[in-house]
UniProtKB/Swiss-Prot annotation:
Family, as annotated: Belongs to the peptidase T1B family. HslV subfamily.
Full protein name: ATP-dependent protease subunit HslV
Entry function: Protease subunit of a proteasome-like degradation complex believed to be a general protein degrading machinery.
Cited InterPro entries: ATP-dep_Prtase_HsIV_su, Ntn_hydrolases_N, Proteasome_sua/b, Proteasome_suB-type
Lineage: Bacteria, Pseudomonadati, Pseudomonadota, Alphaproteobacteria, Rickettsiales
EC numbers for this chain: 3.4.25.2
Subunit-structure text: A double ring-shaped homohexamer of HslV is capped on each side by a ring-shaped HslU homohexamer. The assembly of the HslU/HslV complex is dependent on binding of ATP.
Description of activity control: Allosterically activated by HslU binding.
Active-site annotation: 12
GO CC list: HslUV protease complex; proteasome core complex
Keywords of this entry: Allosteric enzyme, Cytoplasm, Hydrolase, Metal-binding, Protease, Sodium, Threonine protease
Species this chain originates from: Ehrlichia chaffeensis (strain ATCC CRL-10679 / Arkansas)
Domain of life: Bacteria
Length: 189
């Protein structure tokens, strides 16, 4: 994520892992303004649609809250249809002159699907049930994939909470815009 100026808040790590009937989204708590840490305990994960959807954002905070509100209204118009609501949001985000300027990405999940939504109009379902966004996203993604795809006996017995916490901790040790104050939300069927 490019840091254009010191007046915009950037940098975070959001990680989503789905296994079986459980999905967890985790985010770190750091908010940076330029090269300065402003807050260590921000909550970047939110529940929507009567707690049936969880979402996390990376990017400018005010922009993300605008997108949360828009997504919530799309979910009200299309209850129980997360994919359709996300596609409608992405279309608006790409076409609307005001929304096009928003600088954020989102991971959204319900009991059956996980999606990444970008301002380019992309709605992507990740492979292998693992998705990550933000400045530390690639580190968290690599760590989560390594933990999930290992074939040894230990990895098969790891809980999703352990995997996501470990992957986020690894990302926080590499990315200067990510801390180890991890907040998680989960949906379990």
């Amino acid at each position: 994520m490019e840091h254009k100026d010191n007046s915009t808040m950037y940098g975070t790590t959001i990680l989503c892992i789905r296994r079986g009937n459980k999905v967890i989204i985790a985010g770190d708590g750091q908010v940076s303004l330029g090269h300065t840490v402003i807050k260590n305990s921000a909550k970047k994960i939110k529940r929507l649609a009567n707690d049936t959807v969880i979402t996390g954002f990376a990017g400018a905070t005010a922009d993300a809250f605008t997108l949360f509100e828009r997504l919530e209204s799309k979910l009200e118009k299309h209850p129980g249809q997360l994919l359709r609501a996300c596609v409608e949001l992405a279309k608006d985000w790409r076409m609307d002159r005001y929304l096009r300027r928003l600088e954020a990405m989102m991971i959204v999940a319900d009991k059956s699907v996980s999606l990444i939504i970008s301002g380019n109009g992309d709605v992507l379902e990740p492979e292998n049930g693992i998705a990550a966004i933000g400045s530390g996203g690639n580190y968290a993604l690599a760590a989560a994939k390594a933990l999930c795809e290992s074939n040894d006996q230990f990895s098969q017995n790891m809980t999703l909470e352990y995997i996501i916490t470990t992957a986020m901790k690894i990302a926080s040790e590499i990315c200067i815009y990510t801390n180890n104050n991890i907040i998680m939300e989960k949906i379990e069927d």
